[in-house]
Amino acid sequence: MFIRPVLSSSLGHAARSSLRSQAPAVRQYATEAGKSSGGSNLPLVLALGGVAGIGAWYGLGGFDDPKKVSNKIQEKGKEAVDQAKGAVEGGALNKDQFVEFTLKEIKPYNHDSATLIFELPEGKKPGMGVASAVVVKAVGDGLKDDQGKDVIRPYTPITSPDTVGHMDFLVKKYPGGKMTTYMHSMKPGDKLGIKGPIAKFAYKANEFESIGMIAGGSGITPMYQVIQDIASNPSDKTKVTLIYSNKTEQDILLREQFDQLAKKDDRFTIIYGLDKLPKGFNGFEGYVTEDLVKKHLPQPELADKAKIFVCGPPPQVEAISGKKGPKGSQGELKGLLAKLGYQADQVYKF
């Protein structure tokens, strides 16, 4: 049993748990200078222009020892260079430094999820590729872990990379989750430190004939990014099948977008799974089984014409495809997909 909503090319830029795997004794739940001459730089500072130049001079030390002023100028210059290096061309993000963005609005989504809309500078896009991620942290000393270190977590926006003026995150609040609890407590006008992008899988149109996706809970967000990109490009002929599992029907994220456009584009098949199916719900119940994957996802025999994406809580990822390696590496392919004969280069773990 499955639902086959199809996504329209009109999705464009406006649209954008408990996954379980049948594995032995495993049940997972869907629930981050220039060289100095040593001389005085006073003429250079004053040459910056009028009052602004004098103000800059005072800001750098005024009548202090010329060497101190020179050192301060070099420090400021290095800081500006570092910022320029990290800035993504034409984008609001910086991959090397946290930039503070202001929360414009927070929209409740369901009983435990909300969409947080952050303002970008006027006319700016985020400056990231499809399915890229960012890391976030509270500003100042707002949120620390048990060791006193900043809590930093990764997130994937649900807005497309071409969205101008704002960047949206759909955040599910998990019990005991420090960052999700913090983000849900934010109010319009509050700021959040965001750094990125972190490059993930570099999707290219028509690179594969078929893509299979297995997601649980908030692991839907990178999948949605890829789906948005394909749906907005009529020339991309890639077929996509998404298996998306949650605890209850109310936990399904972005369902409105999927269902609203379900009948308009046969490139997409969406298969919902729940712990227990309510009466009349079209989907599968319980585990993601080998038979389910065999029936609906592109098979290993397609070789480099197929790709399988996996995203969700660590227990889910481990059961489906083996856990990720250190420092964000892919790690060894194990779990259900390995058992079915998929090769490591056919699978990507977000």
Curated annotation (Swiss-Prot):
SUPFAM superfamilies in the record: Ferredoxin reductase-like, C-terminal NADP-linked domain, Riboflavin synthase domain-like
Localisation: Mitochondrion outer membrane
Residue ranges occupied by any FAD-binding FR-type domain in the UniProt entry: 96-204
Membrane spanning stretches: 43-63
E.C. numbers: 1.6.2.2
GO CC annotations, alphabetized: mitochondrial outer membrane
Pfam families found in the cross-reference section: FAD_binding_6 (PF00970), NAD_binding_1 (PF00175)
GO MF annotations in UniProt: cytochrome-b5 reductase activity, acting on NAD(P)H
Cofactor: FAD
Record's catalysed reaction(s): 2 Fe(III)-[cytochrome b5] + NADH = 2 Fe(II)-[cytochrome b5] + NAD(+) + H(+)
Residues involved in FAD binding: 207-242
Signal peptide: none
Family annotation (InterPro entries): CBR-like (IPR001834), Cbr1-like_FAD-bd_dom (IPR008333), FAD-bd_FR_type (IPR017927), Flavoprot_Pyr_Nucl_cyt_Rdtase (IPR001709), FNR_nucleotide-bd (IPR039261), OxRdtase_FAD/NAD-bd (IPR001433), Riboflavin_synthase-like_b-brl (IPR017938)
Keywords: FAD, Flavoprotein, Membrane, Mitochondrion, Mitochondrion outer membrane, NAD, Oxidoreductase, Transmembrane, Transmembrane helix
Main location: mitochondrion
Function summary: May mediate the reduction of outer membrane cytochrome b5.
Entry's family note: Belongs to the flavoprotein pyridine nucleotide cytochrome reductase family.
Protein name: NADH-cytochrome b5 reductase 2
Species the sequence originates in: Mycosarcoma maydis (Corn smut fungus)
